[in-house]
Amino acid sequence: MNDTTATRCGYVAIVGRPNVGKSTLLNHILGQKLAITSRKPQTTRHNMLGIKTEGTVQAIYVDTPGMHKNGEKALNRYMNKTASAALKDVDVVIFVVDRTRWTDEDQMVLERVQYVQGPVILAINKTDRIEDKSDLMPHLEWLQGQLPNASIVPISAQHGHNLEALESLIASHLPENDHFFPEDQITDRSSRFLAAELVREKIMRQLGAELPYQITVEIEEFKQQGRTLHIHALILVERDGQKKIIIGDKGDRIKRIGSDARRDMEVLFDSKVMLNLWVKVKGGWSDDERALRSLGYGDL
């Protein structure tokens, strides 16, 4: 991000279909892991702010759930509504797309981005994997035709390729404003929220094809005692079969989930962590609007 003489601050929405690299991009820009990632679609469920202050420029990134077509359940409707809402009242929109692949869900996002009045940046992800860059041209020309006023920046969210150019362009679009957050603040989310997300990430990474998407995590206790942070997390599933999958044979899987989550928590919170996990069946929670609100999913 380039330094400027003017003090600038604004909101930047990162949007795109599921699993296109939005959270990976945010983590790389921030220089640390904040948003959870996995190879599974719909990993991100909530909007989350990632705040980067560099010199006179403060960019407030809004990491959003991927917009998707399978929106029958209340949870899916919440995620789509949350992602769409992020396009309103922001100063810049980054639309992340794959270098070659275009899906119905990309089209769904495009149709919403076309109504955005402010600056739009098309971030073409994974371009570092293409040897002959001329292969990109037909796709880029088509995208430019769909969003004629958008800037196009080829990037690699995973490896950080060309992110300096992306951040410089973002900074140029931010309005002159005093900073909204302290210089050392990196997110608006609580430590309890981040802990729950880390547990959910490890579940998604451990389970692979067995993954039950009807899972969520609640933090029941988050308490610093001396040099140790004690965290009790409740994993909610919808069926007994899902509970058995998460626990695994003789509890081996839930032990791995806990061990992996604890390591990341100790880095994030800079503290020794004692993590306890429980699994509970709560049938139909992902399609129960009242249950979703009680679990922190907001208005539907």
UniProtKB/Swiss-Prot annotation:
Region (G5) residue spans: 155-157
GO biological process, one term: ribosomal small subunit assembly
InterPro entries assigned: G_ERA_dom, GTP-bd, GTPase_Era-like, KH_dom-like_a/b, KH_dom_type_2, KH_sf_prok-type, P-loop_NTPase, Small_GTP-bd
Membrane-related topology note: Peripheral membrane protein
Record Pfam families: KH_2, MMR_HSR1
Chain ranges of the Era-type G domain: 8-176
Keywords: Cell inner membrane, Cell membrane, Cytoplasm, GTP-binding, Membrane, Nucleotide-binding, Ribosome biogenesis, RNA-binding, rRNA-binding
PROSITE patterns: G_ERA, KH_TYPE_2
Region (G4): 125-128
Subcellular location: Cytoplasm; Cell inner membrane
Binding site for GTP: 16-23, 63-67, 125-128
Region listing for G3, in residue ranges: 63-66
Entry GO MF terms: GTP binding; GTPase activity; ribosomal small subunit binding; small ribosomal subunit rRNA binding
Region (G2): 42-46
HAMAP family for this protein: GTPase_Era
Family, as annotated: Belongs to the TRAFAC class TrmE-Era-EngA-EngB-Septin-like GTPase superfamily. Era GTPase family.
Name the UniProt record assigns to this protein: GTPase Era
Source species: Pseudomonas syringae pv. tomato (strain ATCC BAA-871 / DC3000)
Gene: era
